[in-house]
């Protein structure tokens, strides 16, 4: 059989054969797809049955083409090059048409990505506007139950009064840069900015000791030093920070002059100043230094692309995390954008060991550069997740995303630094690299309009990652065992939990998914997160007492190093967990439609048996909401009990800790009011109805039935009606949710009427109680840190 592209002359060499009458060729009626693949075609139009069964978008028949090809031309003695090119061109057009139709079908599909357009525009009265995307906590809160959002906003508006008093008392600001514009000018000394910086620096000997201690790897508070080369930094210090010849009374020398290296590389000075800010000045950076750092950050010519610029920007980002951690990274957006663009221009996304080969004396060790790239990827991931925007360093610069099934890039594909992330070591850095390799594609999918992210599968992968990469969860939720875990492991685990809660929330809010598994997992992950945050704070407090006792002097205003580090690790997790917990319980506790009643008693055994040693919850595990609230209260009691009074005093030095305490107090007040008024109204009406019925209609079973996400109860309460309102939900998923809600979906008329009566009474009592709370003159009890 002759192949396409090598047609042969089939004419017989004999004269008799040529003279024979040739058979008339039948017109081609099969579609192009069937003819090309030699399949049987029933020639139906517009689409044959073969193409239908194969899921094609349409058939193409040859009569659509008017180009006439003579028999002689088709069956010549030599291949027709022009004809072959024409065939190849038509086949390419066919393939392109198929791809275009597939893309159009995908873009108009009711199952397209539902997350990409999920956002919230924050509008301030001052005119400031910020768009928060699908993974932002602000977006989730703004799209939650209106009753809860209104309740939260009312109480928070009152607490803001006390917050502003605290800020005035402690002279706290989140805007140190703009403060320089508003404050009085620096004294005119006739000196340049570098000389002004010299005047506020510690002595040469003290600065040298601070820098040396910064590279002490025995203390985990120095973790960020791994992005720098110690030998290079010390050399930069001695060559750029010149001491005076005169001795101070204590025998030390002041720094007399700052000397930039060749080509005006001021970033070497900037890196060393940031080390001093992190380990010496803390939140009280002198205005002279702040002004110089702002200038370095704002330089925007091509003359600034030194490795030290990327290191400087990363250290500035880290310093902000230590001092001005605000939960959603909104103050990090511009800084991280600069950091990421600088990294790309420096080629850190390429094979670092290849492009910077034999340049160690200028840029530092290869290991420090690779660590710098990992930290930049992490900072980009944090801002993207917490703000809700696309990654600044997209997959084109992060080729790990191109690997399928976790397979390592081939050895000949060695142009990118992606191989850095295939670290199989059991170190904290190895765990962090593997997490970023797993999580970045998940985050990318959220913004890919042509994708349909499988968040349930992503959650499963994240839970498996926790099981395979970390100590058992009990090591993090037990206040004694957590001391056996490296602090940097807590950093990575908190990242996993934060992403896990984000995906759970998206499933709950957008798809209104109310399955037993999801709601159990939400509660369990939140409680594990609470326990992790509280235990980490107390652990770091104890480490500070041991290593930094000078910070416990009552005249000290700075947060001790380990406690500051605990904020870096958990400040983004706490707001998401606490807000999610309160919103979830508020919604469940104010559901009355199906006639379920809140149990007024919590058995001590239920609290004792609650298993916080795993993230995987059995399907048949009934999770009582009141028990969950009791466990939540017990966890946070570690912050407020008398044994930890000193802890609260130290926490009061940090704006972030103070806000966290206030948030927890707000949420607890809201939930306590809901539980109180619902329990009172239920008990009154159920007792009254029981007396009237004289036992003719028994509600005994239902009286003690708590609202909880059990297999029989939770599906009935909310899954069915809400799932029906989700046009973007795939049919199979809708069907599964409906099946969960189908059984036990019957209530008697008396119970239905009673549920409505209890609902009306509850909201009346709740609204009156809420007015009393809002009319109180003093809200210090919600903002108390002592």
UniProtKB/Swiss-Prot annotation:
It is found in: Cytoplasm; Nucleus. GO terms for biological process: regulation of transcription by RNA polymerase II. The keyword Zinc applies. Residues 1-25, 721-747 are annotated as: Disordered. Residues 31-59 bind DNA. It comes from the Eukaryota. GO terms for cellular component: cytoplasm; nucleus. Signal peptide: none annotated. One of its GO terms (molecular function) is DNA-binding transcription factor activity, RNA polymerase II-specific. It holds the Pfam family Zn_clus. Residues 737-747 have a biased composition (Polar residues). Keywords: Activator, Cytoplasm, DNA-binding, Metal-binding, Nucleus, Transcription, Transcription regulation, Zinc. InterPro entries: Yeast_MDR_Regulatory, Zn2-C6_fun-type_DNA-bd_sf, Zn2Cys6_DnaBD. The keyword Cytoplasm applies. Present with 125 molecules/cell in log phase SD medium. Transcription factor involved in the regulation of multidrug resistance genes. Acts in concert with YRR1. This is Zinc finger transcription factor YRM1. The gene is YRM1.
